[in-house]
């Protein structure tokens, strides 16, 4: 683990966190993360039979070539209008950031049944795009928090025979957590050059060994998402290097998962079985 700005430490990634008025009190509450170049991407989301509007919309996108994500609070059990709002958020954010329509995932967690305040969010998305920066990873990590007591993330350097790889991470989650993911969002960025199929396979294994093994209060969420973005700025990974990258991704997901358990709402003890 090294010092860095989380998801924006790998070259080619920018992020921001702004106050759009979702939380009140001037708190950062809208996060935007983008890659400046085409990426391989992998996405694992909730197994809930009632996924949120953000998950429903993001599933319609080409999951292997996403360029980033926009993150806010609350948009589950909101019916067809919720999906319309999620689509508008994704498309408006992409346009504001100068990215192709359909290239940004949309993620939400928060109060179930409340529609997004789209007027405030539209202004917030413009502000988030204007604030995008290679130093914005920590603001992004702060903006995605809801009931979290502290931001969760880190920066990691992986020394491989084929060259060094940098990995950044940001996550949120503190309640409604059970095996098969949780009320959680997690984002991992890397400059590694990985084929989309290889990245998806590694991401699924990492989720199974980390986020799918934690529980705080035994409740499943409709919004859980793990998104991994690899922009290819670094060395290509294959063979042993690819296997070592997969091991590192798994270790990072376990690290983030343990932070979620330690930050469980009302938790006084963390137990490993």
Model-derived features: positions:
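Flexible, glycine/charged-enriched surface loops at secondary-structure junctions
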Residues: 99-103, 134-141, 155, 211-223, ...
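Glycine-rich phosphate/pyrophosphate-binding loop regions near the starts of catalytic domains
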Residues: 32-88, 96, 105-107, 179-199
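N-terminal amphipathic/basic leader segments beginning at the initiator methionine
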Residues: 1-46, 50
């Amino acid at each position: 683990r090294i010092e860095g700005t989380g998801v924006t430490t790998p070259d080619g990634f920018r992020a921001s966190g702004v106050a759009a008025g979702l939380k009140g009190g001037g708190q950062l509450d809208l996060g935007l993360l983008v890659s400046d170049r085409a990426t391989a991407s992998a996405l694992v989301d909730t197994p809930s039979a009632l996924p949120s509007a953000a998950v429903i919309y993001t599933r319609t996108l080409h999951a292997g070539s996403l360029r980033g994500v926009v993150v806010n609070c609350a948009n589950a059990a909101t019916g067809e209008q919720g999906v319309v709002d999620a689509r508008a958020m994704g498309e408006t954010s992409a346009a504001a950031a100068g990215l192709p329509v359909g290239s940004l995932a949309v993620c939400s967690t928060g109060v179930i049944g409340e529609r997004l305040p789209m007027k405030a969010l539209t202004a917030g998305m413009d502000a988030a795009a204007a604030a995008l920066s290679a130093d914005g990873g920590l603001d992004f990590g702060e903006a995605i928090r809801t009931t979290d007591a502290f931001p969760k993330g880190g920066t990691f350097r992986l020394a491989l025979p084929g060259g060094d790889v940098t990995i950044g991470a940001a996550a949120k989650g503190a309640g409604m957590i059970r095996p098969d993911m949780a009320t959680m969002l997690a984002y991992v960025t890397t400059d590694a050059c990985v084929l989309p199929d290889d990245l998806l396979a590694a991401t699924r294994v990492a989720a199974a060994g980390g986020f799918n093994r934690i529980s705080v209060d035994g409740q499943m969420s409709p919004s859980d998402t793990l998104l991994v973005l690899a922009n290819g700025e670094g060395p290509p990974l294959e063979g042993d290097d690819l296997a070592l990258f997969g091991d590192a991704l798994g270790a990072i997901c376990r690290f983030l998962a343990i932070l979620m358990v330690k930050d469980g709402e009302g938790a006084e003890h963390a137990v490993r079985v």
